Amino acid sequence: MNDNREQLTQQIIDAGRFLYGRGWSPATSSNYSARLDEQRALLTVSGKHKGQLGFDDVLATDLAGNSLEPGKKPSAETLLHTQLYAWNPAIGAVLHTHSVNATVLSRLVRGDRLVLQDYELQKAFAGVTTHEGQVEVPIFDNDQDIARLASRVQPWLEAYPHCPGYLIRGHGLYTWGARMSDALRQVEAFEFLFECELKVLSLSR
């Protein structure tokens, strides 16, 4: 294992421990990845507990989502990761989490997007410099056909290239960043904002 791969794999392992510890990636849910180079990514293998990841639980794939390591099966949602790397070469890490807040809020919001507005913490997202604007988070209906789901995500990415993430209804969050630390920061910001939105909804009823 070369130094770069070892470092990126350790970042994925550390991310899993952090996200599991916060309750945002329970049991074997979720999947994480990091860009290895222009043609390859490292992803968590299918069905592994994210708080207990080891070096053997991460594999290399091409950007079409195909495993480059015989005997290792990538997550069923690998294509949603590699789609992002192929779309934007500046993306270096992608995190998919399954928190209670993201799951519940995605089911409560009517329509195809969640609008975050007037929160100071919006500035935690890459490219956002003020609380005064809106951050639109698309919500896609869950689909076991990942290629079909990816085909619905792609037009949004093209139309809104500064979008910091998206939700899958009743499922979870996808967010990304130039580095793993950036993606983790965005997960944490999203989770704070999701909790705020849920509190607002509960108090307004």
UniProtKB/Swiss-Prot annotation:
Any one annotated GO CC term: cytoplasm
Disulfide bridges in this chain: none
One Gene Ontology term from the biological process aspect of the record: monosaccharide metabolic process
SMART domains per the UniProt record, alphabetical: Aldolase_II
Binding site for Zn(2+): 96, 98
Keyword annotations from UniProtKB, A to Z: Amino-acid biosynthesis, Lyase, Metal-binding, Methionine biosynthesis, Zinc
One Pfam family hit: Aldolase_II
Cofactor(s) the record lists: Zn(2+)
EC number(s) recorded for this UniProt protein: 4.2.1.109
GO MF terms held by the record: methylthioribulose 1-phosphate dehydratase activity; zinc ion binding
Catalytic activity: 5-(methylsulfanyl)-D-ribulose 1-phosphate = 5-methylsulfanyl-2,3-dioxopentyl phosphate + H2O
Alphabetized Gene3D superfamilies for the sequence: Class II aldolase/adducin N-terminal domain (3.40.225.10)
Enzyme class of the recorded protein, top EC level: lyase
Domain of life: Bacteria
PANTHER family: METHYLTHIORIBULOSE-1-PHOSPHATE DEHYDRATASE (PTHR10640:SF7)
Annotated family: Belongs to the aldolase class II family. MtnB subfamily.
Name by which UniProt lists this protein: Methylthioribulose-1-phosphate dehydratase
Organism whose genome encodes this protein: Pseudomonas aeruginosa (strain LESB58)
